[in-house]
Design a protein with these regions (language model features):
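ATP/NTP phosphate-donor binding region
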Residues: 1-55, 59, 96-111, 122-133
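Short glycine/serine/threonine-rich phosphate/pyrophosphate-binding segments
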Residues: 15, 63-69
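General beta-strand structural signal in soluble alpha/beta enzymes
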Residues: 33-38, 81, 113-114, 162-163
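Short glycine-rich anion-binding loops that position phosphate/pyrophosphate groups of nucleotides
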Residues: 61-64, 85-87
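Active-site catalytic pocket residues across diverse enzymes, especially alpha/beta-hydrolases
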Residues: 72
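Proline-centered loop/turn at the N-terminus of a beta-strand
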Residues: 76-78
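Catalytic core of DAGKc-family lipid kinases
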Residues: 89-165
């Protein structure tokens, strides 16, 4: 793996400085590293990935990883999170491990762990289905009309599971 694409929040100076160091590190070892858009501003946008992208590095916290996963859904490119936030339970790397991991990836010494994505869509009272969404971790349901009863029907892999009022 030699060609990387970095997704990071553009509003945090320390993250941008880290991304520059990461880019320099990769390029000094013969790789390429393009920079991505802020996933917070681009939930509906497609990432414009270079054709030779072999791996996506997400620098941020869990929220950045979740939004990046939505943006790259269906692209079949490995993604790894680098914790630049607080908890980082979705991030596999941190400051102490990132450069060794980059070296290993560039040497072809890595394995890919498949993660399940959730999908869902809303159906209005007239039976019209809304846009399908993908999610890495969870889907939260809330009424846009305030305190209102919601009718929820849950299917798993196309099989009815339960209904809730």
């Amino acid at each position: 793996m030699k060609h990387f694409f970095v997704v990071a929040r553009e509003d945090k100076k320390e993250i941008l400085e880290f991304v520059q160091k990461l880019t320099d590190y990769i390029e000094k070892r013969g790789g390429t590293c393009a920079y991505g858009i802020n996933p917070d501003d681009a939930l509906e946008a497609e990432l414009d990935l270079p054709e030779d992208t072999q791996g996506i590095l997400v620098a941020g916290g869990d929220g950045t990883v979740i939004r990046a996963a939505q943006n790259i859904f269906g692209k079949n490119i490995p993604m790894i999170g680098i914790n630049r936030g607080h908890l980082g339970y979705l991030c596999d790397l941190d400051d102490a491990s990132v450069y060794d991991a980059i070296d290993a990836m560039m040497a072809g010494d890595y394995s890919i762990e498949e993660r399940m994505m959730l999908s869902g869509h809303m159906v209005d009272a007239q039976g019209n289905a809304g846009k399908e969404i993908q999610a890495l971790n969870d889907i939260v349901l809330c009424s846009s009309a305030g305190l209102q009863v919601m009718h929820v029907v849950v299917y798993v892999n196309g099989q009815y599971l339960y209904a809730y009022n």
